[in-house]
A protein has these predicted regions:
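Phosphate/oxyanion-binding loops and surfaces in catalytic or ligand/nucleic-acid-binding neighborhoods
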Residues: 102, 130, 313, 436, ...
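A long, amphipathic alpha-helix that forms part
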Residues: 204, 396-442
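Active-site rim elements
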Residues: 196-200, 408-423, 430-431, 462-466, ...
Length: 529
């Protein structure tokens, strides 16, 4: 706080003629109006379309919604509008809101708790890939200039009693207006929220940033305590010993419709997997389009991690990852790729040497290996997800600003190159298992798919609770085994079924799990190595 005060003082000394004095209540109101109007004006058309009915746009409901959002924002800001917090909080909101507005306008993303948590966990390299020259005007007009105006302000406060009373009166006023607005137009606003799959909520800046941050903080803390308690409450044991290595490989953003194995006709994207006999190609669906929330759908159930259950049953368990599994492997820890052979840059194939080393130590019994192919088909710079030699489909999209700098053809070329590389990595993992001679079951699936400008949508990241478009929901599920297995025929397979299937393959009995979702029949006997 003191550092910020000194920075503001120095800034005012450099630009003395631009200094201005303003009361804390006036500053709060002006700041809230300026930030709210500037950010949402850029997205107004997309918001307004959800308030249309047979007679045109329902402006009364739209105005009521926007007014309620503004009043709630101002009311929340007043809670922090104190002598030592008002400027830091205003600057923080300005920076976050400006960046959020850019991604909402340019990519149509929705800002909720999952997006906030993703932003916190995003790799530095991925952050750099999202930056482009298109962002400069947004940063200048929505961040730099407003922050300068905040630093130049000499905010005055009356006595504590008087300024608290003034804040309280304004707080009660704006909250009352918000409540009245929502009450009067409740039905119309509710319909717009449902019709838009809550888009009107997740795109209203900075209300979305504030609510998303609060929910993200809450969700980050609560599950940890719940998991710690549940981890202590259950037991797991192997009911029938055997010899089997189960390898679960989790991909990233690779959608099923671009796999030629599944009938993709644009080009052949799976030349290596097509040569492997005995593949089981299953249609699976994801229900979460954010990696942070999608991975637990595969690796967690009843707030207990799969690796925790398997390791507690006495099965040796390891996790080899490119990027991270977001704390879904804490029971045994992650082993991350390192010393990669592409000039220090790591790709998904760099996980494979770890797998080969592990298989070389296998003698007998059960073993569980989780592989994370975290590069996968993640945008926006798809060409960064594979070595240069896999850039077979040209011309690629070479810019992070996909929506403005690349054609649809370039976008598909780049994305299909990632699928070509996924094909190589998955086939090499199967090859490593075959050459090792171990009895194995190999399972590959992606955490979610990806939108490539279908209906104007790009990438992924739909908030939890909102139905996914097909291109983000439909994912590949590929199974290969060196031992006899039977797979239940289903129209579609769910990600949580993988959890049950792994436990079933190891004959693990654990109190909290009934294994009803298992789609791989447990072999009656597993031949020793």
């Amino acid at each position: 706080m003191q550092a910020l005060d000194r920075a503001g003082y120095s800034f005012r000394m450099v630009f003395p003629r631009l200094r201005y004095q303003i009361s804390h209540t006036t500053f709060s109101a002006v700041f809230a109006v300026a930030l709210y109007v500037a950010c949402n004006a850029l997205n107004f058309a997309k918001l307004a379309r959800w308030f249309q009915d047979a007679g045109g746009t329902d402006y009364s409901a739209l105005v009521a919604y926007l007014l309620a959002g503004f009043c709630l924002f101002l009311g929340f800001f007043l809670l922090f509008a104190h002598r030592y917090t008002i400027k830091p909080f205003a600057i923080l909101l300005t920076v976050c809101s400006g960046i959020a507005t850019y991604f909402i306008v340019k990519y149509g993303v929705a800002i909720d708790s999952s997006m906030i948590r993703n932003a916190v966990h995003t790799d530095v390299t991925e952050v750099g890939q999202l930056l482009s020259a298109q962002m400069i005007p947004y940063i200048l007009l929505l961040v730099i200039l407003p922050v300068a105006a905040i630093l130049l302000a000499d905010i005055t406060f009356e006595s504590p009693r008087r300024y608290l009373w003034a804040s309280l009166k304004l707080f009660v006023l704006v909250v009352s207006i918000a409540a009245a607005s929502l009450y009067i137009e409740y039905q119309a606003i509710f319909r717009a929220g449902n019709a838009s799959n809550k888009y009107i909520v997740y795109s209203l800046v900075p209300v979305n940033v504030i609510s998303g941050s609060i929910n993200a903080a809450s969700k980050a803390v609560k599950p940890w305590f719940k998991k710690q308690q549940k981890d202590m409450e259950f037991s797991a044991q192997v009911s029938r010993p055997g010899n089997l290595v189960v390898v679960l490989a989790v991909g990233e953003s690779s959608r099923r419709r671009n796999f030629s194995l599944y009938g993709y006709e644009r080009r052949k994207t799976n030349p290596e997997l097509e040569k492997i006999a005995g593949l089981h190609l299953l249609d699976a669906v994801a229900t979460r389009a954010s990696t942070l929330y999608a991975l637990p759908k595969i690796l967690e159930k009843n707030d207990i991690m799969l690796t925790t259950v398997v390791s507690r049953a006495g099965v040796p368990t390891v996790c080899y990852v490119n990027y991270t599994l977001y704390d879904n492997c804490v029971a045994v820890g992650e082993t991350k790729v390192s010393n990669c052979g592409h000039g220090g840059k790591c790709f998904d194939e760099d996980v494979l040497p770890l797998l080969r080393q592990d298989l070389a130590t296998y003698k007998s019994g059960y073993r569980f290996v989780v592989l994370h192919f975290g590069g996968g088909s993640h945008g926006p710079l798809y060409r960064e997800r594979h070595p240069p030699e896999f850039e077979q489909f040209k011309p690629p999209c070479a810019d992070a600003d996909v929506a403005n700098k690349c054609s649809v053809e370039q976008l598909y070329n780049s994305y299909d190159n990632t699928i070509l590389y996924v094909d190589h990595v998955v086939s090499q993992a199967i090859d490593a298992l075959d050459k090792s001679g171990v009895p194995y079951v190999f399972i590959y699936l992606s955490d979610h798919g990806e939108s490539l400008l279908e209906d104007g949508k790009l990438f992924h990241g739909v908030p939890p609770g909102v139905s996914l478009p097909a291109e983000q929901a439909d994912i590949p599920l590929i199974v290969k085994a060196s031992v006899p297995i039977a797979i239940d025929k289903r129209a579609v397979y769910q990600q949580p079924d993988v959890f049950d299937s792994v436990l079933n393959l190891f004959s693990i009995e654990a109190g909290p799990f009934d294994l009803e979702g298992s789609f791989i029949a447990r072999p009656e006997t597993v031949d020793p190595r």
